[in-house]
A protein has these predicted regions:
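An N-terminal assembly and electron-transfer interface module characteristic of large anaerobic redox
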Residues: 1-179
Length: 179
C-alpha cells in the first residue's frame, strides 16, 4: 500500500528565528555572499574615522520572518542607508525586501536592492528600491568591477546617501586580466 504525502517541508522550514544582536548604525549592508561583506567591512575598517557607522549581516541569518522583523525593528529602523545584494532576486528574500521597502518609504531611508548575479539590473529590485536607477547602477558597478578601491568608493557613495546627497562617485574599471 502506498501513502500519499499530505505535507511538505523545505530546508527553510527548519530555520529557527535568531537575534543578530546588532546595534543600530547609519549604514547597513546585507548579502548572501561572504566576499561582499568582507570587502565592505575591510574598506570601512580602513576609513572608519571619516565614515558613518556600519553594520554588515549575512542574509542566511535573516531567513526566518521573525528574525527579519526583529532585525528591522532594532537595527534597520535607525539606518539612513540600507544596501542589500541579493542572489536570486526579489523572490529569494521576498519578505525582507517588502518589509525593508515599507520601512524605507515610511522613514525616508535610502534603500538599494541590487542583484547578485551578472546582469545589469533587476526590474523588481529597482522598483522596490527607493533610489533612482542611475544611482543603483553606480552602486552595482562597484561590485561588478570589484577590488578594494571600488569597495571604498561604494562606502563613499553610501556615506553620501547617509548625508542626503546624490551618488556622484563612479566605480573604477579593473583590468580583467594582467596589469
Amino acid at each position: 500500500m502506498h501513502l500519499l504525502a499530505t505535507s511538505s517541508a523545505t530546508l527553510d522550514d527548519l530555520v529557527e528565528p535568531i537575534d543578530l544582536r546588532q546595534a543600530p548604525a547609519d549604514m547597513l549592508a546585507l548579502s548572501f555572499t561572504d566576499s561582499d561583506l568582507a570587502g565592505i567591512a575591510a574598506a570601512w575598517g580602513a576609513a572608519r574615522d571619516r565614515l558613518p557607522s556600519l553594520r554588515v549581516a549575512n542574509l542566511r541569518d535573516l531567513r526566518h520572518p521573525m528574525s527579519v522583523d526583529l532585525w528591522i525593528d532594532t537595527v534597520a529602523a535607525h539606518a539612513k542607508v540600507i544596501l542589500v545584494r541579493l542572489l536570486g532576486g526579489h523572490d529569494w528574500w521576498r519578505y525582507g525586501c517588502d518589509r525593508l521597502a515599507t520601512l524605507a518609504r515610511e522613514k525616508g531611508i535610502a534603500l538599494a536592492l541590487l542583484p547578485g548575479e551578472d546582469r545589469p539590473s533587476d526590474e523588481r529590485l529597482t522598483e522596490t528600491s527607493t533610489l533612482p536607477a542611475d544611482e543603483l547602477a553606480a552602486l552595482l558597478a562597484c561590485f561588478r568591477e570589484g577590488g578594494p578601491s571600488n569597495m571604498a568608493a561604494l562606502l563613499e557613495m553610501m556615506a553620501g546617501l547617509a548625508r542626503g546627497e546624490k551618488v556622484r562617485a563612479k566605480a573604477k574599471p579593473v583590468p580583467k586580466a594582467g596589469f
